[in-house]
Structures are given as C-alpha cells and as structure tokens.
Amino acid sequence: METIYQVFVSSTYADLKDERRQVSETLAKAGFVPAGMELFPAADQQQLEFIQRVIDRCDYYVVMVGGRYGSLADDRISFTEREYEYALSKGLPVLAFLHGSPEAIPVGKTDENRAKARKLKAFETGLQPDA
C-alpha cells in the first residue's frame, strides 16, 4: 500500500492567498494531501485548538512568510507563529519559505503596525537555519 503524506500549509491569509493556493495545488499534484486554514472558520482560541488537532494528523509543516505577522492569539503571538511552534513541538519536519525581497512587498501586503512589524522580523529570524 502506498503511503500518502499530509502537509499543513501555514501563512497569513489575505496577503498570501494566491501563494497558498499554488503551494496546495503543487502538493496535491505531487500526491500529498494539503491541509490549511482554508478548511477552517475565522481564527480564535478554539480555532487554534482545532488547528493543532489537524497538525497532529500531518506529516510535514510548511510555513510561508510575507509582509504580515498576522492575527494575534490571546497571548499576542500570531496564529501563524503559534502553529509553527506547535509543529516544532511535535517534531514535524518544517519547510519555511521567506520572501526574498521583503522591501519589494506592496504596502497593502505589509504590516503598518510597528509592533507587528518587529514581531514579524523576530519570527523570520527564528525561521532561518543559522539563527
């Protein structure tokens, strides 16, 4: 019997909707089962618990980071970062995609809030292998 792997695809939503779709389609064409926020209603704390149950059933975790930090959970950490931390805690192999030219991201797809921009930068730094 052939093994089918499930991959959780994580990112902020509105600014990376097209990229998420492309990654999910590519994974599906390659024989993987993509899972991600498209399957879930709006984010809240119960949502995070549901997402964690989905991550528990996944074999891999992919995170894409653009110009936004994302919606904050109760502890003021983004849902995307919480998902990433959870995947790490479960020992899932993680593949992170960071925008190669963040300065070229259109203004409408970046955080205007300076506190969120700082959190995004710290999150990006933690995703890099030599960090």
Give each language-model segment a name.
Residues 14, 41, 68-70, 101-104:
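Solvent-exposed loop/turn segments at secondary-structure junctions
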Residues 89-102:
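A short helix->loop->beta-strand "cap" motif at the edges of active sites that frequently abuts
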